[in-house]
Amino acid sequence: MLPKGANLQKIRNGNKTYAVTPHLPGGFVKPEVLEKYAQVARKYEGTLKLTSAQRIMITNLKAEDIESIWAELGMQPAMGFANCVRSVKVCPGIAFCKRGKQDSVKLGLELDRRYIKKEMPSRMKFGVSGCPNSCSESVIKDVGIIGTEAGWDVYVGGSAGSHPRLADKLAESLDYDDTLRLVDIVVRYYQKHADIERVGQFIDRIGFARFQADVLAEFTGTGAVESPVTGSPVSSEKLTPMPGALTEGTLVVGDPITQGSVIADIIRIYPQTIPVLRGFGMGCLGCPSATGEPLEKAAGIHGLAVEELIVALNEVVLRGK
């Protein structure tokens, strides 16, 4: 059983170590909170690691210590779906930077308040930069916002990782309220129409012109496009690997799930298995490297008995027939 509010980090010689990563909105931390981090890391022999999402991870921890660590930090366990809004990265903006054009801290903290840990089709990351220098790496975020002299420019579909994608500009020169309103439309559109795919993958599947037209139609009040958004490939056919996939699987409808079945195939052909995978602690179903792995490899990384997992998955598949 995965300890509450922790992530499995490493399995070495059969021993599992875990990490906790408390949420720090905007990457801001008070001195007294920072002191608690140090005290806990020292007491439980943890290692402190700054993350790319402006948080502080405490890693190399034992499962039996996790509950006490959260209590001593004085925080609620950082819970949430793996496929959710994972982070809102914020630069100093006009509050702290001489080059800032807009108040990225105000906007970023409001986006954090609204969306952090909200469940999404895949993991989702935001970046808010107060000027075109884009210190929050906004053009490689699912939703990126960049301040200019004229207002806020909104970008969508960026990502880093093994298959990086630069975001597409959706709108420009918006004020604070319109930026929040447009982002809300983007998030709802993505939630409604996307499969288990990042925003950039979703845009590549339906086309940026279609995405932009639908979103801006609602934003401007001119009416949404009537035709439906194109769905997934027919599940009985051989699937095109998701971008970033490591392995091209051969699973089709009616096949039993085996050790060699690729995660991407399993969740697309048998979506009813998603709760089972999450229940076993395999929540990274939007990660290209994870979805491209055979079940046996993924189970090994998570320290799971693959035979037990296969039985549970096939039971769900059989019940659905």
Model-derived regions: residue spans:
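Extended, compositionally biased intrinsically disordered regions at domain boundaries
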Residues: M1-Y18, E226-E248, E315
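Short glycine-/aliphatic-rich beta-strand segments at the starts of folded cytosolic domains
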Residues: K4-F28, K89-V90, G260-S261
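Small-residue-enriched alpha-helical segments and adjacent helix-cap loops
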Residues: V20-E149
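Generic secondary-structure signature for well-ordered alpha-helical cores
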Residues: Q39-R42, G46, G74-A78, I116, ...
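Flexible, glycine/charged-enriched surface loops at secondary-structure junctions
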Residues: G46-S52, P121-R123, K192-R205, A224-G231
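A glycine-rich phosphate-binding loop feature that marks nucleotide/adenosyl-phosphate handling sites
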Residues: V128-N133, G200-A209
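Mobile "lid/hinge" segments at catalytic clefts and subdomain interfaces of large enzymes
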Residues: G130, S134, V139-E197
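Domain-level signature for proteins that mediate thiol-based redox and metal-cofactor handling
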Residues: G244-K321
